[in-house]
Amino acid sequence: MVTICVIPARYGSTRFPGKPLAFLKNKPIIQHVYERAKSSKMIDEVFVATDDSRILHTVESFGGKAIMTSSKHPSGTDRIAEAVDKLLQEGYNLQESSIVINLQGDEPLIKKEMIDQLIDLMKNENDSIGTLAKRIEKEDDFFNPNIVKVVFDKNGYALYFSRSPIPFDREKFIKGFSKNNFMYKHIGIYGYNVRILKNFVGLPMSRLEEIESLEQLRALENGIKIKVGLTEYDSFGIDTPEDLEVAEKCLNTYS
């Protein structure tokens, strides 16, 4: 069964315009992400789905493959779906059951072990989306709206994702930072088969998705399950120019 990775990368980020092309340790961010995806032996091919010719040309300049997509997509998953449609139109060998890995274009610290873990998880999830999470250990991370939190049921299926601190341990937070075992950070990587991907993008943007600016809430609001795999590894999404300095310090640690 074919497994591909598609990296959505748009130029016009509100907080960091041109982010995929910003340099991190002598390489554009998008090249770091692409190389991380290529390091997984479980992925057959990697593509960047972009809305900007500058990103496309940059990807091609380092030997990568890029697909031009519309600038009007409300989420990265919608952009990926257009890229997959184009691949299908060109006769690429994708089936309804083929796995598509969505690796966010601003996650240059993702490890191949995380990608491989998600692919393994997806082999048993024909009707669900897959993703990863890691336990939160720092109070600042729990209250940081740029770090998405997730809570899940006893079977590992997501109940909710939020930029707010969830679950909020009322009694313990009155006295100080709670050290409970239910605080998890969402890692910016998804997996789905082609059928679920098509189903997802056929749904209208949901109210919770708009409020939280989290595309995965569209799935939950429409009854699509999201299986959460727990990882011991961390990652770091770049949201602002200031994050580049932090990422540079972390890069050697996470390599």
Swiss-Prot record:
Record-listed E.C. numbers: 2.7.7.38
Pathway connected to this protein: Nucleotide-sugar biosynthesis; CMP-3-deoxy-D-manno-octulosonate biosynthesis; CMP-3-deoxy-D-manno-octulosonate from 3-deoxy-D-manno-octulosonate and CTP: step 1/1; Bacterial outer membrane biogenesis; lipopolysaccharide biosynthesis
A GO cellular component entry from the record: cytosol
Cross-referenced InterPro entries: Cytidylyl_trans, KdsB, Nucleotide-diphossugar_trans
Keyword Nucleotidyltransferase (UniProt): yes
GO molecular function: 3-deoxy-manno-octulosonate cytidylyltransferase activity
Compartments where located: Cytoplasm
Pfam family, one: CTP_transf_3
One of the protein's GO biological processes: lipopolysaccharide biosynthetic process
Coarse class of the protein's main subcellular location: cytoplasm
Enzyme type, top EC level: transferase
Entry keyword set: Cytoplasm, Lipopolysaccharide biosynthesis, Nucleotidyltransferase, Transferase
Reactions mediated catalytically: 3-deoxy-alpha-D-manno-oct-2-ulosonate + CTP = CMP-3-deoxy-beta-D-manno-octulosonate + diphosphate
Family annotation (CDD domains): CMP-KDO-Synthetase (cd02517)
HAMAP family to which the protein is assigned, alphabetical: KdsB
Family: Belongs to the KdsB family.
Free-text function comment from the UniProt entry: Activates KDO (a required 8-carbon sugar) for incorporation into bacterial lipopolysaccharide in Gram-negative bacteria.
Protein name according to UniProt: 3-deoxy-manno-octulosonate cytidylyltransferase
Naturally occurring in which organism (per UniProt): Thermodesulfovibrio yellowstonii (strain ATCC 51303 / DSM 11347 / YP87)
Origin organism lineage: Bacteria, Pseudomonadati, Nitrospirota, Thermodesulfovibrionia, Thermodesulfovibrionales
